[in-house]
Amino acid sequence: MNNENELLRQDILSYLEQHEKKDMLRFLTCGSVDDGKSTLIGRLLHDSKMIYEDQLAAITKDSKKVGTTGEKVDLALLVDGLQSEREQGITIDVAYRYFSTDKRKFIIADTPGHEQYTRNMVTGASTCDLAIILVDARGGVKVQTKRHSFLVSLLGIKHVIVAINKMDLMDYSEEVYKQIQEDYLKFAEQLDIPDIQFVPISALEGDNVVGKSEKTPWFDGTPLMEMLENIEIGEDDNLEDFRFPVQYVNRPNLDFRGFAGTVVSGQVAPGDEVTALPSGKKSKVKQVVTFEGDQERAYVPQAVTLTLEDEIDISRGDMIVKSDNLPLLNTQFKTHLVWMSEEPLMPNKQYLFKFATKSTPGVVAHIDNQIDVNTLEEADAMHLNLNEIGVVDVKFTQPVACDPYKRNRPTGSFIVIDRLTNGTVGAGMIIDEIAGDAQHTSPNFSEFELEFNALVRKHFPHWNSVDISKL
């Protein structure tokens, strides 16, 4: 019995060690309606042996009732989980699925293709490293294909695989494949996507999805799964700009005061000179503390506690950065804004803007233009409606430390919260600061009030008192 327990323990340890060393790729699938997004994900799960027997039996049964593939098992039903999705044969919600191979772990976001669900797609794409854009070989590059590509570019996704699907319906024609490739690359010249790859597939038949197909001898590339396993995403991490939004002031006893949070970009080590923003106070890193003990260096995306050599005033929402590499610090910024509420965006209405751990009141001071996501044309607008995207000027009541979104996604993004309903109504990406408004005036507090407020925040951080010197 003891021998069996030991073997079981060794198997568990071996399994954990194997998966611990794998890196993870987050990707989304997007494309026009009925291009086969859900079928492709079902094929990836099926061919990578990630479907249990009871799941396969269930979708085999459902295929006879609501399937769209005739006598074959409708693999899209693995992903289209909502009853309304199955009955209509479309994807509405963002469906997340997880699978792994010997080389890598994956999280898939299957996003809806309809224009009225743009906000769902933006939500699914916001954390992804790569996008698979499906193009129906029968119809080529459509308006929806261009819209999804624009959104992928807007959200800073650097890797795109254009999967030209349903090649079986076009007799695996090389001419069709090359024409679509040419059309897409011509359109993509307007976008900021540095890495674009192409693959001809049939999600229904499995051609070039996991294994290389004999039906496309003219294609000298690798199958889709091999692309996903081998694409390099480590270089996308920003290791240059150290940014550490403070989540919590950790003070377990009178002898220890640290600042807990996650390194969202860059790296830091004891001895590095840092600046706390927005106060501008400087110090040096004393320790990098983790659950497993002190570390010589902290990297993105580690969660750590930093201690400093000096007792400077830092609270939740502040950002610790290296003194020789400062972010933008201002009260006004030009941004891209995706509106997600059925109530239209009204300029000069008070909203709450949340950056990482910092929340600050503010307004949309001006809508520069609205971007037509289908044609990329810009037009004047008085307000933004649900699923519309615009370039807007935002103004906050206090300075905010952030970076342009294209340089640093974690510190260049924010969400907009309705102060009345507490619902998320928008998502934004910083383009740049608006010069000439870096000045900030504070209400007149007495010296005693300022000192007392600092004392309370230092010794009772769990009270979450507001720093009145920043009001």
Swiss-Prot record:
It catalyses: sulfate + ATP + H(+) = adenosine 5'-phosphosulfate + diphosphate. Gene3D superfamilies: P-loop containing nucleotide triphosphate hydrolases, Translation factors. Residues 31-38 are annotated as: G1. Residues 89-93 are annotated as: G2. Keywords: ATP-binding, GTP-binding, Nucleotide-binding, Nucleotidyltransferase, Transferase. Residues 110-113 are annotated as: G3. Residues 202-204 are annotated as: G5. With CysD forms the ATP sulfurylase (ATPS) that catalyzes the adenylation of sulfate producing adenosine 5'-phosphosulfate (APS) and diphosphate, the first enzymatic step in sulfur assimilation pathway. APS synthesis involves the formation of a high-energy phosphoric-sulfuric acid anhydride bond driven by GTP hydrolysis by CysN coupled to ATP hydrolysis by CysD. This is Sulfate adenylyltransferase subunit 1. The lineage of its organism: Bacteria, Pseudomonadati, Pseudomonadota, Gammaproteobacteria, Alteromonadales. The gene is cysN.
